[in-house]
Every structure is written in structure tokens, then in C-alpha cells.
Amino acid sequence: MALVLRLMGGAAGMGAKAVGGACCELGSACFRQITKGLPHPTECGCLGSLFFYLGIHDHQKFNVLVEIHELDRVPKSCSLYMTIEAGRWSATSQVVKVKGQDQRVVVEERLMVHIRQVDNEVKIFLFKKGLVKTTRLANLVLKVKEDMIDKKFPKRTWYNMKVENGKSQPRINLSLHKLDPGLPTNQSPLLQQAMLIAQQEADEKGEELKLDLAKMTAKERLTFFSQVLEGPLERLNANGGACMQFYYKAVEVKPDRWEWCYWESAAACKEGKEKEGSIPFLAISLVLPDRKNRNVFFVRYHDKDNQHDVFFRRVDRDRNLWSDGLYEFIEKLRAYRETCSTRVPSQKGADGEEKKKKKKRREDGEDSSGEKSPRKSGGKKSRRPSTSPRLDISTARRLHSPRAQVPSKSPCAHQQMYEEVMISTQSSVVGDEEPQT
């Protein structure tokens, strides 16, 4: 009996220790989470400047844009994602899948975090996502001063990651970009790329970036965002033909009329030579990334008589920057046009409208009093061809989101994707029509 009581007491003691240890661990985790969210005194502007000029801190606060290009030497046939941590800020990438025996995967994703004065390192973790649990495979620690500032924020550099679990030894290809600390970290792709271009131009000139979007007019913001859609692209028509490379640029060809113009080269564009062609932005009704090929996206646009389907292949930047940026710019341009249309017209505009109404009444055979005059018996319609410009679809209903994905598994990926887009578009249009009797 005494032995049984002794065993029961020992078991109770071990259970109490286990419960106590678990409670302590939980309490410490909660304490770390709470203290992690508390701001540091140097986040105050005056204290931060004082600490920096006294030499206590070796850098001031800034935002860093981490561009993840590729992963290499990763496990086969798995799902991976990355997390970036810097002080109180963190960001998580989307899940990328490693297919078959391939141990190299293209990521092409951007994550932005805020670096405080007190932060000395940025940590990047690589996770393997499974059905039951998630495993942390490796990590990379970048020193803010030594690896970023002193090396002038290196671009497309390979880093070997420290292995935590598994047999593979991953490495990661990164580009680091320094941005203004006043910018929000949750930016849209269009704003993010526009700010990055502006920052790079300021760095090349050796000037400080002074940019305030809130003080810009709607027209100035459109011009600022339009630079995102400038660069080389390979163009392939949906009906076949050779793939040709052009240099594209968003241009305001007339007041409030924007077109996506293209030249044979960047030099031809900058020298002011005649453009090869153009696509009105408001005539674009569909922007669709290719699901199977991260380098390709599909665009459908319209002119007066026909619709045109074109595939584009990226050259020097991620495909999503083109497709998402194109979609966002069209939405902003459409909103700007709608805002302009609600304004009170000037006297010159009112006179123009009155002249158009009078001309229309004369064509319809109305007299000045508003009553229709009898049409002459021998009258003929004018054979003069129509001179109306290309169709400007400002109210076109978007059929697909730019982030929508159309599967294509056959070797002729472009052709199958085009056929499925045609089928889905026709079904959407037919579904809106009333049944004919």
C-alpha cells in the first residue's frame, strides 16, 4: 500500500512539473508577443535622431523591398513559402510548388518590411507546407549594416541558407531595394513599382526622393503611374506568327486619351521616332495571366470593327508587374474619366454641344422649331464613309480579373488558353442576352 501511495505521489509530482513547465512556456511566449508589439523609444523622431547622431545606432529607419527571384536546391515535389521578419514587422510570401524532380523554382515575388533604427538584422525563413504540419527547412540572416547598407543593397545575389531540417541545402536569389520610410508597407503592385522607379531615379541623380501623392492632382498621378507600363515586351498574336519584341510606353496622345504605344526599340522611343502602333487603354476588355507559364499574359482589345487577342511575354521584369499594373492603370484611368465627365462643362464645351445638337436635328430633318420637316421624295443617304475613331470602351464590363487563371496543359499552351478564353467569354456574353423566341 505504501508503495502504491509513493508511486501515486511521484506521478502527481511529475504531472505538476509538466503542467508548470507548460504554463511557464506559454506565459513566456505571451510575454514575448506582447513586448514584440511595443514600440521602441527610438521610434520617436527626436529620440531616433539623437541616438543616430550620437553614434548609438548605425543607421536610420527605412523600408526595404525584398525581391525574391528564385530558390535552388530545394526538396522535390513539395509546397514552399517564405517569411521575412524585421523587428516588429513581418511579411509572408505566397505558396510556390516544386514540380517533379526539379529542385529550382522561380518565385518572382516582392515583400516589403520596415527597418527601425534599433533593428540590426533581417531574417528570412523557408517553410515546407504539408498536409498535417509545416516544417521550417532553413533560414537566412542578413545584417542591415554589413549586408545591405555597406553593399549598397545588392541585386540578384545568391545567398546560401542555413539548414534546420531535411537534407537539402537551399539557396535563394534576392534583390534588395531601399525605399522611403514614410511609404506604407502594404502597397499595390502599381504603386510599389512606381515608387521603386522614382527611388532609383533619385538615387542615380544623388538626390533625396521628395514625393507626395496626396498633393498630386489626378492627372499628375496618372502620369506618375504610367511609367510602370514602360519597357520591353515580346508580342505574339493569338492566330500565330513570329514573336517580335517591342518597347512599350503609356502615352497621353490627346487630352485625357491614353494609349499603350510601342516602338521597335527603346532607342527609337527616346529619339521620338514614329511609333509602330498603339492600343487605347479603355479599349482593353481583358487582361489574363497564363496559369502554366509565369512569363506570359493575355490581352484582348477592340477597335471600331474587330477584337484583337495578343499574348505578351515578359523580358526584364516579373509578368505580374505587367498584368496587375496594366489592370490597375486601366481602372484608375476609367475612374479619372468618370470624374471628369461629372464636372460642369465650360461655356466653350456647352457651345460645342449645342452645335452638335443642331447638326443632328438638321440630319434628322427637323426645322428650327423642333418639328420634323417632310423628307424629300428623291433623297438619298450620304455615301461618305464613316470617320469615327476607334471604339473607346469606357463602360466595357470586365469579364475576367487579371488574377484569374485559365488552365492549359497541352503542348500548344497558347492556343488552348486562347480557345478556352474564347469559350468562357462567349458563354458570359450569351448568358446576359435574353432568350429569343
Curated annotation (Swiss-Prot):
Disruption phenotype: Intracellular replication, parasite egress and motility occur normally; however, host cell invasion is severely reduced. Complete inhibition of rhoptry secretion without affecting microneme secretion or rhoptry morphology. Residues 341-437 are annotated as: Disordered. This is Rhoptry apical surface protein 2. Pfam families: PH_CERLI1. GO terms for cellular component: cytoplasmic vesicle; rhoptry membrane. The C2 domain is a non-calcium binding domain. Cooperates with the PH domain in the binding to phosphatidic acid (PA) and phosphatidylinositol 4,5-bisphosphate (PIP2). The PH domain cooperates with the C2 domain in the binding to phosphatidic acid (PA) and phosphatidylinositol 4,5-bisphosphate (PIP2). It is found in: Cytoplasmic vesicle, Secretory vesicle, Rhoptry membrane. InterPro entries: PH_CERLI1.
